[in-house]
Amino acid sequence: MEVLIPKRIQLSLILALTVTFCAGQVLADEIRIAVASNFAEAIKEIAERFEAKTGHEVILAYGSTGKHYAQIKNGAPFEAFFAADVERPKLLEDEGRALSGSRFTYAVGKLVLWSPKPDVVDANGSVLNTGDFRFIAIANPKLAPYGKAAKEILQARGVWDQLQKRIVRGENINQAFQFAHSGNAELGFVAFSKVKRPNRAVPGSFWQPPQSLYSAIDQQAVLLKSNATARAFMAFVQGEEACTIIQSYGYGTL
């Protein structure tokens, strides 16, 4: 009789075998991971846990999903790619630049309209329609899935066209956050993970748009090279410990 092993147990076994094998190695391995900017804080904590357990080093490169995709197509030496969408990992898989069957959803992103000042953004995001601000920051919709989602929300609220001269576009969602945080824009659409931090309140005011206003931000990862350490890291990301970390930064998990 065939015995089916739950996926999380399979992933734990992969990690355990890798740790056991690596204990006998003189030198630890080093892997390079391309990561969507919105996921920077969460994956840094996950990588630190993985390094402590395995002795391997995880080098993280942050940027917009579109920019990383272009770099990978041009031969950038990454072992894995954590995107902010489904499209780019799937394209890499279809193009033969990623390992078939390695793609999975590691997080579901959420977008918020945030201002570092209290009382600027109310529970309904009314400031979008009243226009009581000079500039609003978003990520570039052509490069960043969070920027595309921000555009969809502004279109749904009927203000996209009229706000064109007041929109400050960041290359990625972290840059959009910096524009708002520094005061170069009074408010901005940012990843919920920038507002919801484990054990720390982020000052300001925010509105969390209903999911019906923008396309789901399913964030997928994919292996680019058949590397044992990279496989172990991907398995670790899908385990319970990493999922708890991901959720603590305001993401959903499947």
How would you name each of these model-derived features?
Residues L11-C22:
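Bacterial N-terminal signal peptides
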Residues G101:
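Active-site phosphate-binding/coordination module
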Residues L27-G55, I59-Y62, G66-A76, A83-V86, ...:
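Exported/periplasmic ABC-transporter solute-binding proteins
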Residues E2-L13:
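Bacterial N-terminal signal peptides that target proteins for export
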